[in-house]
Amino acid sequence: MFCTRGLLFFAFLAGLDIEFTGLRSNLSGPQQISLFDLPSEWYLKTRQSVQQFTVCQIGLSVFSAIEGEANKYIAHSCNFYLFPTTFGILDSEFSFQASSVQFLNQYGFNYNKFLKNGIPYMNEEQEKKIRHDILTGNWRVRSSPDKDQIKVVIDEVTRWLELAKEGDWMTLPGITGFQAFEVQLVLRQALPNIWTVLKDEGVVVKKVSKQHRWYLQNTSCDRESCWKENILLSARGFSVFFQMLVKAQKPLVGHNMMMDLLHLHEKFFRPLPESYDQFKQNIHSLFPVLIDTKSVTKDIWKEMNFPRVSNLSEVYEVLNSDLNPTKNSGPEIVHASRCEKYVETKCPHEAAYDAFLCGSVLLKVAHLLLQKIYHIDPVPESSFPQYLDVLAPYVNQVNLIRAGVPKINFSGPDYPSIRPPILILSVKRWPGVSEQQVYHKFQNLCKFDVRRLTRSQFLLLTNKFKDARNILKEYRDHPTLCISLYRYWRHSPNVNCLLQVCGIVTAWALLAFILGRSGT
């Protein structure tokens, strides 16, 4: 792999981006994510989508300092096409979402590399099952295409054995990679008088005596136990690199990276737990320093009055333009040799390119923040530790799309909501009105999430204060649609019911008291 353990060890940060076969299940009603959701509710809804779709490409860009050159960084960027391990009992099911396929196809995603040459991967639970089956000899070929190919191979080798002498060998060409381990495992289990070796040209099968076979199994460098460990290592595939990334404990940088973190946990660590707090603890243990460039750029964009941007590429363009006052004094970033594809070529939504943008944006924004502290440009002796210091308020604050809070805090309790207040809509002379009808009624003016409160009342919530003010003003004197600020103690049906019960109890108590006194 391009990214050795040593390269990760000496790196300052790792940019990450992941592409998926789908983003969200088309859930309806209460299962849809909304601005009303608490982080724990948002997590449980999104967890279903993460379990349904899979990762098709991971991009990593590892940034290291260039020795002897101040504030200069070199980026090693690489794409990994992934495909779930199909080995023994493992045969994952996953879905494609048409819009996601269309989107990636629009940007030139190579589905052949994903489906034909994807690197296998598994999480820790899957690895335990496979390890047990391989080491105990309970392993079986499960998929029909593999069974058919294995049958052809066994028939071919069996016919050859009938005429072969001890010491003779034959080659099975075109069998490479992980499949070669599978073929060898089956042949060794099925035929006691052969030995197999993997070479560049394919799997080499040699006829041997049973005594020689025993000797090879127990004394050679390719003895059974070591060989089975190699099979397991091959089956783990990208998961080996994931563990290297975890052990390196470097700052992990992404853009709107919440979905990336969910998939990293589910696909490479463990199945997502039902507990939202447990998920947060697990991620913080794996990656103690997370930085979401979406959270960082949100604040700096308002402060610097930069033009509005809608994606990571546009953020990068603004920071590389003359609009950035530190454009010429900021960190210099170069691409490593053999990683120079992106020097002249822009490849938006290619995972490694977006990972490179994440790391670059972070360094440039950090320099901008540092300059604002010193009030001079260039900043004297700017360094990555200084960058981390100014980024401290953003560490482990991951942006959250469409939820009751704007971000998740992975190193502690989540912050309270800073969304606009909830509004309450009271409807008159509109029998049978639905949430969908209410949504369409206001969508041209502003976008609200709608939740029914009673038969004729609905809660409205937006993520823009301006929209809340506008609709309150627009519908101030409307004859059939009355909109006001929602007050829990005033509008909640539960509170109203409780107050009514209390009123009845109080009235009965008062009546009993009066009747009791009159009886005496």
From Swiss-Prot:
Subcellular location: Endoplasmic reticulum membrane
Keywords: Disease variant, Endoplasmic reticulum, Exonuclease, Hydrolase, Magnesium, Membrane, Metal-binding, Nonsense-mediated mRNA decay, Nuclease, RNA-binding, Transmembrane, Transmembrane helix
PANTHER family: POLY A -SPECIFIC RIBONUCLEASE/TARGET OF EGR1, MEMBER 1 (PTHR15092), POLY(A)-SPECIFIC RIBONUCLEASE PNLDC1 (PTHR15092:SF22)
Record InterPro entries: CAF1_poly(A)_ribonucleases, RNase_CAF1, RNaseH-like_sf, RNaseH_sf
Gene Ontology molecular-function annotations: 3'-5'-RNA exonuclease activity; metal ion binding; poly(A)-specific ribonuclease activity; RNA binding
Family (UniProt): Belongs to the CAF1 family.
Stated name of the protein: Poly(A)-specific ribonuclease PNLDC1
Disease: Spermatogenic failure 57: An autosomal recessive male infertility disorder characterized by non-obstructive azoospermia, due to error-prone meiosis and spermatogenic arrest at the late pachytene stage.
Catalytic reactions on record: Exonucleolytic cleavage of poly(A) to 5'-AMP
Transmembrane segments: 495-515
Cofactor or coenzyme needed: Mg(2+)
Membrane-topology annotation of the record: Single-pass membrane protein
Site (Interaction with poly(A)): 294
First-listed, main subcellular location of the protein, grouped into a coarse class: endoplasmic reticulum
EC numbers: 3.1.13.4
Provenance organism: Homo sapiens (Human)
Biological function: 3'-exoribonuclease that has a preference for poly(A) tails of mRNAs, thereby efficiently degrading poly(A) tails. Exonucleolytic degradation of the poly(A) tail is often the first step in the decay of eukaryotic mRNAs and is also used to silence certain maternal mRNAs translationally during oocyte maturation and early embryonic development. May act as a regulator of multipotency in embryonic stem cells. Is a critical factor for proper spermatogenesis, involved in pre-piRNAs processing to generate mature piRNAs.
Any one biological process term the GO annotation gives: priRNA 3'-end processing
Superkingdom of the organism of origin: Eukaryota
Gene for this chain: PNLDC1
Binding site for Mg(2+): 17, 19, 260, 354
Annotated GO CC locations: endoplasmic reticulum; endoplasmic reticulum membrane; nucleus
UniProt KW RNA-binding keyword: yes
